[in-house]
């Protein structure tokens, strides 16, 4: 008997016990109704004893419903613990110490003194209360003939960061821990006793449903445990339950596969950016190759976080998958530099969109208590993609330097299979995706267009685009270049001011990407620390690999081996802080020790030389990356802790998004420093060779070729100037490492200011 057969057998046995329990509870309720009706008529002591004997006889015959301890005590009912009920073994039921009537009242969420009054009401009132709009909407999600995405991807119920229910099954749970979920498609009356499902919803009045609120979705399982949920019955066979859990696991696997290939694609572009730019003879535009990817990645996350409020998730998933697959194909087939830049923009937009959708959809599939395990699995998957990327690139590397194109084509067939599986699951049942827009949908769309989010996205996009153009493009050769530069700088300043005003305005406190600057000052300093830490990483990783490739002349296999410790840096950096760091403890000294040690590693990176020992090649990038990973995890946890509770489900995507924004600024400034330093040093050190009899015209050609392609330096550069050119590259990399040290210093200052604000707030709370 296989594992699946044993699971089905256990589920069938459990379903039989549940049905028996339901029938016995109905019998108890019927008997109690008779007792209540007879209570109005004076009875003798023999009749009362006979009724009590019947109740005890029924309770003794029930293996799932225990008898009450004291029948005379009818006091405040105890709330039913849903997790306890579902966690009981199959051969024994939940232990309930209250009387059967109190048990009924506790399941319904009513006090004991009001239960009798409700029983005297006509059945029509109970039916009206039971048949709520929320209960009918849950039926779609509980219907196992429908795909698990049908209820969350319908255009009538678009997914947003404010509508993240707690699911009954974790996407990364073990196969042995399968919860039993049952469905009900009929309205239940108050005369029947119901079984509480693992994940019921919380009814909320219409006044509480706002455009930025959770609406009728419970914020935590505690709301359900407090008795606020309406009872409903669910009936589903064990085969359908196993099939539904299999669907959810398949979907979670597909999303993690996308995350793996996104990480692999990102690592490839970060590692061989200088090699790609050299092949296109655009080495001085090295930063543009990476900044275009990071910029489109951040914009994709912001846009899809907003579109998820007004559009169907099915459509958004299709667009995101198509963008990522198309970008990989264009990266493989691009023959010109600007075509490749466009391909990286498409890939980055698709990757950012998939990350935004994954962070929100996976929160629906996993319970709040299990979100840490889901995030841990995602971090391990991401780390594996980062490490495997350079090794996959080495498989297709050739002596001509064009093998890196095939590395971008690797994710395409796997992503096509993923897309086919997800689309077949989503569109297996007819939905209302192409239905007519309702007035509610149009009103929501109109309110979304008038919300501050789109203005924030627009101003931030213009700010980053102009910033990338100023730092990555050569505007000196254009006519009226002074005017163009002044215009771009003006746009940068205006967009920055507008973005700051939108974020600090009290009117726009409810925006999706708001950092809540007016709400808690600690949030802005955590976000500044995250952004500048990403900026520091985006300086040392691309230009650290540039140092390995150009200065040390390492092969792609040797480069992949030097970067293999990055996996342990990511995993250890995340787990050491998330599982062993007390987030609310007074760990100020430990924070500064970690920050100071990481800052010293950044300073040590500035002293790299032409001949670096092999053991230092393994740790010169991995150790600063480890410290930065720990700092990023710490700041991210602090941001989640102090962010508004109703926005916590999307705070992870917001952190990654603004990290990408900081990385865009960091790589742009790093590329600008690298290019300017390289041009200046080559003119200072190469042109003096004219005194030795070399023509200035030939020396200028050497400088031009050296700034356009590092491959030309190693293959065709004259021997008399080769060592000088390598020294110029080394000094340019050192200057970029100095810039990364400055960025990380700002991160340390942000942590210091955060701790000062935190200490003041704690002192104020203690005094009050």
From Swiss-Prot:
It is a multi-pass membrane protein. Keywords: Amino-acid transport, Coiled coil, Glycoprotein, Membrane, Phosphoprotein, Transmembrane, Transmembrane helix, Transport, Vacuole. Residues 274-282, 332-334, 397-406, 469-481, 544-562, 609-617, 675-734 are vacuolar. Residues 132-159 have a biased composition (Polar residues). Residues 1-252, 306-311, 358-375, 428-447, 503-522, 584-587, 639-653, 756-768 are cytoplasmic. Residues 9-40 form a coiled coil. The keyword Phosphoprotein applies. PROSITE patterns: MFS. Residues 110-121 have a biased composition (Basic and acidic residues). The modification Phosphoserine is found at residues 62, 99, 106, 160, 192. The chain crosses the membrane at residues 253-273, 283-305, 312-331, 335-357, 376-396, 407-427, 448-468, 482-502, 523-543, 563-583, 588-608, 618-638, 654-674, 735-755. One of its GO terms (cellular component) is fungal-type vacuole membrane. Glycans are attached at residues 480, 553. The keyword Repeat does not apply. It is found in: Vacuole membrane. PANTHER family: MAJOR FACILITATOR SUPERFAMILY, VACUOLAR BASIC AMINO ACID TRANSPORTER 4. Transporter required for vacuolar uptake of basic amino acids. Belongs to the major facilitator superfamily. This is Vacuolar basic amino acid transporter 4. It comes from Saccharomyces cerevisiae (strain ATCC 204508 / S288c).
